[in-house]
């Protein structure tokens, strides 16, 4: 059987790939593996607003109870709320039913350990192994030993109080627009900003189970851009379906992506002596403009593979405080153990208020260099040709030398398709477009 777990838990089309049976098995195997079968597990369960969430929650919880576990059901809450509340409630694990920014037909199941961290590959593999071995040797409680379900109706209040505590002071005087993606942030983000005194304008906060991420949220920011200008807001903030990421819009309606947000936050943290080792962790997909800006600010950047789990790994290893991705997954380790859209939104808002500057002015800390991303079609066994072929390697080296540190070439094989992705950044869009197309042609010619 192929690996069930992807980079962010188990994901697929609900009721087709991610069936009730799969959810039941994951609940049962997860409850067993995460407590080593030594005691009755206590597992926190949360979900986003998808219509399939209730079906999968019922099955997942049945699996947990069948192992004698206690399922603490929080209802609809952001993914980072599950990470935080798993710790706060002293649970053995947390589970989120969500497919993040994906369309409504998808759903997913993701585990956190008792510390609120995403599971390492080894534990995920053990859960899969228990399922594949048909629960051989796994005890089957009966009678009084079967587990119980607890519902906490106001868990979101605990998360809101935690989030408010991540900034000093209030947000009075700020006029803020929020796009909740008809997702899990529809209560928490609005209540938090109102509690902190901001003047709040909201769109896409009427989830009906079917409209999550539909032309809204951090992956579709057109409506928020218009709304910010129309309402005369100081800035806008867009969450994705499970609210583990956040992107911003300045007062003119321009998108301020994760690279800009990280640059603003890292500089502020450094200026206030809160940036340990003057270092931030980013992925290889961050724009070279961020590297140029941070070098000017004397902030070191550590690069990881794409994926917030790799960013977190590096942060934990060296004790860095901030890291993230261009997509708006930003981790503030002083506050939470995973990307947290609401915490990110609050840090940025607090900086805007404290600095008394417009977001467009703060975002001028960096200049985003033009970028082009193309695919070269190759067979799966030829995905490393760009490393192995001397002519291709020589061409890449020549291009980078010509750019003199004001651009770069990034080539990486697709993990799922017979493609090599060719990304170029540089000062002139036309120039890099031509260079990228020529490089794709060369790679494809060499693989025929």
Curated annotation (Swiss-Prot):
Names of the cofactor(s): Mg(2+)
PTM (free text): Activated by phosphorylation.
EC number: 5.4.2.10
InterPro entries: A-D-PHexomutase_a/b/a-I, A-D-PHexomutase_a/b/a-I/II/III, A-D-PHexomutase_a/b/a-II, A-D-PHexomutase_a/b/a-III, A-D-PHexomutase_C, A-D-PHexomutase_C_sf, A-D-PHexomutase_CS, Alpha-D-phosphohexomutase_SF
GO molecular function ontology, one term from the record: magnesium ion binding
PROSITE patterns: PGM_PMM (PS00710)
Keyword Isomerase part of the UniProt annotation: yes
Record-annotated active site: 100 (phosphoserine intermediate)
Top EC class, one word: isomerase
Residues binding Mg(2+): 100, 240, 242, 244
Cofactor binding description: Binds 1 Mg(2+) ion per subunit.
GO CC, one annotated term: cytosol
Keyword list, A-Z: Isomerase, Magnesium, Metal-binding, Phosphoprotein
Modified positions (Phosphoserine) in chain numbering: 100
A Pfam family this chain is assigned to: PGM_PMM_III
Reactions that this protein is recorded to catalyse: alpha-D-glucosamine 1-phosphate = D-glucosamine 6-phosphate
UniProt GO BP: carbohydrate metabolic process; peptidoglycan biosynthetic process; UDP-N-acetylglucosamine biosynthetic process
HAMAP family for this protein: GlmM_B
The protein's role, per its UniProt record: Catalyzes the conversion of glucosamine-6-phosphate to glucosamine-1-phosphate.
Family in the record: Belongs to the phosphohexose mutase family.
Protein name: Phosphoglucosamine mutase
Organism this protein belongs to: Clostridium tetani (strain Massachusetts / E88)
Lineage summary: Bacteria, Bacillati, Bacillota, Clostridia, Eubacteriales
Encoding gene, per UniProt annotation: glmM
